[in-house]
Amino acid sequence: LITTVLDITWEVGRTGKLTPLAHLEPVDFMGVTVKRATLNNYDDILRKRVGIGSRVLIRRSNDVIPEILKSVDDGEPANPVTIPTCCPACGARVERDGVHIFCTNSLSCTPQIVGRLEHFASRDAMDIEGFSEKTALLLVNEIGISKIPDLYELTPASFSGLPGFGEKRIGNIPVSYTHLRAHE
């Protein structure tokens, strides 16, 4: 299936790795509207000759994840993508390590902090029920959580007044955070 790349942005993960994300002209593919696809890394962009405005061949890897296979345009892209010189989230400098690009600001780059908190609270780690990326972002932005040990200081009162935390949800917190403290 062929579509057009409208933009390419860079997302920051919990390890600080920047991953290029292609925003596509929406296209119906196997019953799903595909609007975005990963490009893995900068070398992948170059190898596939993808730029903004490129017409690209896409597929759904394992019938799930949208993937750009290649540009169907002749020659190099008219609007090539450049390597970012700073983190799109926090503005810190970036470093290249092989094919990957990393934000150097691991202490205060919000997407990295949110990603680490979410990973720590996930089912495969501490299994804190109801803790999501949205919750982590709220804790970082509203309470100032910046590292995993800060989670151990939270009490139900910490959540009072936060958007999405009514009495019922706050009442469920002790169960989850008692579980967290049990792993100390």
Model-predicted regions and their roles:
Residues L69-A125:
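Cys/His-rich short segments
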Residues L1-A37, Y42:
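Long, charge-dense accessory insertions within large macromolecular proteins
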Residues I128, L139, S146-L162:
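A short amphipathic alpha-helix within small helical-bundle interaction modules
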Residues T178-E184:
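Conserved small/polar residues in nucleotide/adenosyl-binding loops
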